Amino acid sequence: MFSSLMLVSLLVLTLPIMLSIFNTYKNSTFPHHVKNTISYAFITSLIPTMMFIHSGQETIISNWHWMTMQTLKLSLSFKLDYFSMIFVPVALFVTWSIMEFSLWYMHSDPYITRFFKYLLTFLITMMILVTANNLFQLFIGWEGVGIMSFLLIGWWYGRTDANTAALQAILYNRIGDIGFIMAMAWFLFNTNTWDLQQIFMLDPNLTNLPLLGLLLAATGKSAQFGLHPWLPSAMEGPTPVSALLHSSTMVVAGVFLLIRFHPLMENNKTIQSLTLCLGAITTLFTAICALTQNDIKKIIAFSTSSQLGLMIVTIGINQPYLAFLHICTHAFFKAMLFMCSGSIIHSLNDEQDIRKMGGLFNAMPFTTTSLIIGSLALTGIPFLTGFYSKDLIIETANTSYTNAWALLMTLIATSLTAVYSTRIIFFALLGQPRFLPLTSINENNPFLINSIKRLLIGSIFAGFFISNNIYPTTVPEMTMPTYMKLTALAVTILGFTLALELSLMTHNLKLEHSTNVFKFSNLLGYYPTIMHRLPPLANLSMSQKSASLLLDSIWLENILPKSISQFQMKTSILISTQKGQIKLYFLSFLITLTLSMLLFNLHE
């Protein structure tokens, strides 16, 4: 029953795409149709989700045979388990709010209908990825979110930065896709199937190679350390794109892939250790990078990358349900933070530099209140949405001594989260206004207010509802020292205090020269400088030298002109060194003749 209802809610999403074939696509009401369709799909999806939670079933798989290729049977297969049943309503709710926000933010764009079509396709491909039960179907969704992110990041294609950012996103994801395809090939070769339940049932040995491929895929898609530079660059797209990309679609796809494969990962300690280290490095590195950024959207982008690192850490300590809880809770406040920043940017005539803001608390009370609550939820203040997942992750990491290194990095990153959140509030909302006095600020638009209001309610209450319905629903009694329970809160408060102390110090003490730590953070750990400059420079110089050696030096000089000139020179030297003494020549003839006659007579 509820599998049919869930599939109906997913099919409803395709209606606007079908209608866009006809003239309604040209109609100005098309964006409103898309927004309403998503809201209906969300309400419809709530019914099967509630039924699923209360029925206590584990998984429902709907199978339609598609094709058979020799021994491989491909089917259109939907897997409706806890992960997909909870994620679909969350993604639909967040996207509904983002669509409504887009009606206000993109109202003057001449191609708004195409923009909404792209956003809807983006959502549909994510739904395909989440509900897929075989690797081929999952790959379709995986590539779908990749190409849609490329189109949406480069929406304002007249700007060079937007084009570069879109190319960067697609190229970094290509590196990840190599890992995915390698894993697909390995599973096909060793298990002769792409269906997830069959792979888990066969439980192949020596899964290091495919899981390494899947980890590489997740690193590319979820912007983990090494393949992370595309995420802050993606801020060149419109704010609704940033909100959708960073909350419930693209970036969580990599984490979701690892969650799907947790039955294989939990038995492989090598991959788990690697995942734990990768997540810990990412969460700390990106938190450090966020500290000195001045673009409001880039700070929030780096915070996304930091939270994704936290999710990867959670998978590394073998807690997939906890990582999934953090995906769901993170979607609400992260989308709201982007929408609040979009509201500020739009009101200040596209100004993104937080140093040119200030005093917005009086001018935009609703937006600033939402921004503060979103920042508090991000830092994990008790009883807001972020607390229910973030606090649990740190508590769970505390249960084993082997996690000590990763736990320390996670705690430092959690503290730094409070620092950069305070920095946004301090620079953008408090103090004296630093923008032009003639700027007209107006946030009284129902599309803007309603969309942020819904996510604000979600940022306060969603964590409580989702965490109460996460497995296991009957929680075993746990004993934990009070100091351990309060660790996460303590480091957050420490971060707030540190940020305020530093802000007060900087007013009194001005550094003459920026320190190396500041430079490291501001230049993003020198990573883009090294990786985006040195390899192209090395390739360019190497290709230039090889081209000049092969074409100019060898072919044009050494083989034809130089070889001929060398031959002529040696010949002329040989000829010119002859003395012209005819007696010697005759004598040499005579010696030769005498020797030949002697040899002839000797033979006889």
Curated annotation (Swiss-Prot):
Pfam families found in the cross-reference section: NADH5_C, Proton_antipo_M, Proton_antipo_N
The protein's role, per its UniProt record: Core subunit of the mitochondrial membrane respiratory chain NADH dehydrogenase (Complex I) which catalyzes electron transfer from NADH through the respiratory chain, using ubiquinone as an electron acceptor. Essential for the catalytic activity and assembly of complex I.
Location in the cell: Mitochondrion inner membrane
Keywords: Electron transport, Membrane, Mitochondrion, Mitochondrion inner membrane, NAD, Respiratory chain, Translocase, Transmembrane, Transmembrane helix, Transport, Ubiquinone
Similarity-based family: Belongs to the complex I subunit 5 family.
GO cellular component terms listed in the entry, alphabetical order: mitochondrial inner membrane; respiratory chain complex I
One of the record's GO molecular function terms: NADH dehydrogenase (ubiquinone) activity
Source organism superkingdom: Eukaryota
InterPro entries associated with the record: NADH_DH_su5_C, NADHpl_OxRdtase_5_subgr, ND/Mrp_TM, NU5C-like, Proton_antipo_N
EC id: 7.1.1.2
GO BP: electron transport coupled proton transport; mitochondrial electron transport, NADH to ubiquinone; mitochondrial respiratory chain complex I assembly
Annotated protein name in UniProt: NADH-ubiquinone oxidoreductase chain 5
Protein source organism: Equus caballus (Horse)
Chief localization: mitochondrion
Subunit structure: Core subunit of respiratory chain NADH dehydrogenase (Complex I) which is composed of 45 different subunits.
Ranges in a coiled coil: none
The encoding gene: MT-ND5
The reaction(s) this protein catalyses: a ubiquinone + NADH + 5 H(+)(in) = a ubiquinol + NAD(+) + 4 H(+)(out)
Topology relative to the membrane: Multi-pass membrane protein
Annotated transmembrane regions: 2-22, 41-61, 85-105, 115-135, 138-158, 169-189, 209-231, 239-259, 271-291, 299-318, 323-345, 364-384, 411-431, 455-475, 486-506, 582-602
Keyword Lipoprotein: no
